[in-house]
Swiss-Prot record:
Name of the protein this chain belongs to: Leucine-rich repeat-containing protein 14
Gene (name only): LRRC14
Subcellular compartments: Cytoplasm
LRR repeat segments: 111-146, 194-218, 219-246, 247-282, 283-307, 308-339, 340-360, 364-391, 392-416
GO biological process, one term: negative regulation of NF-kappaB transcription factor activity
Native organism taxonomy: Eukaryota, Metazoa, Chordata, Craniata, Vertebrata
UniProt xrefs under PANTHER family: LEUCINE-RICH REPEAT-CONTAINING PROTEIN 14, SIMILAR TO PREFERENTIALLY EXPRESSED ANTIGEN IN MELANOMA-LIKE 3
Amino acid sequence: MHTLVFLSTRQVLQCQSAACQALPLLPRELFPLLFKVAFMDKKTVVLRELVHTWPFPLLSFQQLLQECAHCSRALLQERPSTESMQAVILGLTARLHTPETEPGTQPLCRKHTLRVLDMTGLLDDGVEQDPGTMSMWDCTAAVARTCIEQQQGRTAEPGQAPVPVEVRVDLRVNRASYAFLREALRSSVGSPLRLCCRDLRAEDLPMRNTVALLQLLDAGCLRRVDLRFNNLGLRGLSVIIPHVARFQHLASLRLHYVHGDSRQPSVDGEDNFRYFLAQMGRFTCLRELSMGSSLLSGRLDQLLSTLQSPLESLELAFCALLPEDLRFLARSSHAVHLKKLDLSGNDLSGSQLEPFQGLLQAAAATLLHLELTECQLADTQLLATLPVLTRCASLRYLGLYGNPLSVAGLRELLRDSVVQAELRTVVHPFPVDCYEGLPWPPPASVLLEASINEEKFARVEAELHQLLLASGRAHVLWTTDIYGRLAADYFSL
């Protein structure tokens, strides 16, 4: 739905040259809507001039591109267009090249009000690659290039210094882009364009490069550190963690593939693990911890006991958890605060089932997002868990992909989940009834790779849809799509 004000604004921007000439005459209250319309419709000339002459101290994508009273479209939920993003960056560059006081003129108050450009919060699902849109990797490169060019083009003319602007961004870096981003961060020190990273994601980056990058980041800005595919091990982690721990406002820490053999621990390995635990105790604001594919068997109590504050999001996918790990978590202060829990890849079918149910009971009042992909949950285990699962009254998302469930099990889940009024998404497995010649119990690898009888599954989908309609739950999405934009980020919960 669009209001008359929105439609009028869109009409004004049809002729971009005339709109740019009219900007100084328009009330500043119109600028936020002008920005959203120009960004949406790719009116790049106007968009560039809007950034150049922005009349407020803050230009925030999260404020301007969300659903508003004039337009229900939330652009933050879409990957941004390359043209619009480039126009914003060009407008910033033009603004930095404009001195605070131009020779022979009075200061132009409107032109020089902008102090913070907040480009955080853009969608980066990494799924569909539309050539007309900009990924976070491209955005990082574009902002980094602007920093470097700004520093290289600086001139020291008295009285002509541009007003500094703080640019807040989420940065993505890998081996290929590391040197470029490092140069950009160095260039922003003392520059009119100050680069501030909110969320950092580093993929496949050597340990020394990760440390060098962390040392260049502003300790007051960083909210999340996400290290992926780095295979740090305990030794590498013990080198990196003190550099991460200096970010006292860090709310989210995502570490993966931290290996250490708990069955045959070495002296060095134990020393590294103790040092890691000591550093983890320095965080005062941590709310999300992800340790996916890390060997934590029998060690979860040591890890979580060091934290100063309770977690709201905990991801322990493929961590080989033992029953005692789940029992400790259920009794800990973290359980009653959890909004998001990911136990994917941990076998919950045997002796882990009872402590897992206890954990669900403890987290029932707060849990919003539960991920149980590839947990070896068959009908028997699911049915035994349903009474406590349905007590999670606030649950919005349930992920069960890769579990050996039958059509009968899915039917029972659908019927019992009717009491969960907040539930919006269920990612379920292909029922075992739809496979041909499936071994029992089927390994997760077989469920992921074996062929599906498409005709049988189409009938199952139709039946589930009819059951949803009959129960008045047509708004709940039941899907087998694990790659869609369904799993919520902790900060969006």
